[in-house]
Regions:
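Short, Lys/Arg-enriched N-terminal segment that forms or immediately precedes the first helix
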Residues: 2-14
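Residues within the DNA-recognition helix of helix-turn-helix
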Residues: 52
Length: 108
């Protein structure tokens, strides 16, 4: 029996913006409220997550997160409107393709 596999990613002007790993990062930031907590949840280094976000923003040409520095009042990170849109778009596409792949897999 064969397994059907696929990868989804979003590009802008031929540059990678968001794939499954990036969607997991944005989702974790959304739920955890900080890059540090998100990186711990995902088992990734803070530096890796930070660099990934910076590359995503550079390739997109706009911010996907708003960072509030730590200090006495804490700090945190939230998704921008564009970050929310990208995450929602990725999840819709990934889910739709997953449904098609599941149906095709049942036909074997």
């Amino acid at each position: 029996m064969y397994e059907i596999k696929f990868k989804v990613w979003i590009e802008k002007d031929g540059k990678h913006v968001l794939g499954r790993g990036g969607a997991e990062i944005l989702s974790a930031i959304k739920s955890e409220g900080s890059i540090m907590s998100a990186s711990k949840k995902l088992g990734m280094s803070y530096r890796y997550v930070w660099d990934y976000i910076e590359k995503m923003e550079r390739n997109l040409g706009e911010k996907v997160v708003i960072r509030d520095r730590g200090g006495s009042r804490g700090g945190g990170t939230v998704l921008t409107e564009r970050g929310e849109e990208l995450l929602e778009l990725f999840n819709k596409i990934d889910s739709a393709i997953s449904e098609v792949v599941d149906e095709l897999s049942k036909e074997d």
